[in-house]
Design a protein with these regions (language model features):
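Short, glycine/acidic-rich beta->alpha junctions
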Residues: 8, 86, 190
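Juxtadomain coupling helices with adjacent low-complexity linkers
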Residues: 2-10, 15-19, 102, 108-169, ...
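Sensory/regulatory domains in signal-transduction proteins
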Residues: 62-123
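Short secondary-structure junctions and interdomain/linker hinges
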Residues: 19, 23, 27, 163-167, ...
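Structured interaction and signal-relay segments at domain junctions
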Residues: 17-82
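Phosphate-/nucleic-acid-contacting segments
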Residues: 172-207
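Conserved mixed alpha/beta catalytic, RNA-binding, or beta-rich assembly cores of soluble enzyme
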Residues: 90-93, 124, 157, 173-181, ...
Length: 207
């Protein structure tokens, strides 16, 4: 992606943030040879992320599996903020021919609307409809769940057995190889800055 194209998508990111409103987070990722990074983010109060936050594991796997060669975009999948807040996510693949050069993500925070509906249901005393609403609202593409992480360290916590994260735990060579292979399969090394952090965690030198 050249600088001119990059600047156009940065402007588009903030434009969509203004047009769609505060319940929509817009995130523009640039994909380079050095990895992916956030170039612009609008309404980031929804996830709490910043320009320094990494690409998500979900998006990294899409890159690693070259999903962008099969589809131009993905719509209406689950995205998780923190431990319990569910929002709706959609991803548009920015391609120069068949080469992925960027990703534009739109995350819709429906929590206010959902809370309002649940309160209305509660006022009407309609049994457990609030729980039913929570269960069916993400029925489409239910198998796809994205976690919006603030740092590469957060991604390691999601991806690696928690017992290995103990600083006193001594990883064997086999365990290090297995962890590195798992992170590769998830596309973690597509994230800019991931290699030195993973190398430090595994206590190995950078390749």
């Amino acid at each position: 992606m050249d600088e001119g194209q990059k600047q156009q998508f940065i402007k588009l990111t903030y434009f969509l943030g203004e047009v769609l409103g505060e319940q929509y987070e817009i995130v523009f990722h640039v994909i380079t040879e050095d990895g992916a990074y956030i170039a612009a983010i609008a309404n980031n109060h929804i996830s709490g992320r910043s320009l320094d936050s990494p690409l998500t594991v979900f998006a990294s796997e899409l890159m690693q599996n070259k999903k962008y060669l099969e589809k131009d975009f993905l719509c209406d999948y689950k995205a998780l903020v923190g431990k319990s807040k569910l929002i709706r996510g959609s991803t548009f693949f920015i391609k120069n021919h068949d080469k992925l050069v960027g990703i534009l993500c739109i995350n819709h925070d429906t929590s206010i609307m959902r809370d309002l509906i649940c309160k209305m249901i509660d006022l009407e005393k309609i049994g457990d409809m609030g729980d039913i609403l929570g269960n069916i609202s993400f029925s489409q593409n239910d198998s796809s769940i994205e976690t919006l992480s603030h740092s590469i360290e957060d991604i390691l916590v999601q991806s690696v057995d928690s017992s290995y994260l103990n600083s006193d735990y001594q990883l064997s060579i086999t365990q290090k190889e297995e962890i590195a292979e798992k992170l590769y399969e998830k596309g973690i090394f597509n994230i800019k800055g991931a290699v030195p952090i993973v190398a430090k965690f595994l206590k190995i030198s950078e390749p």
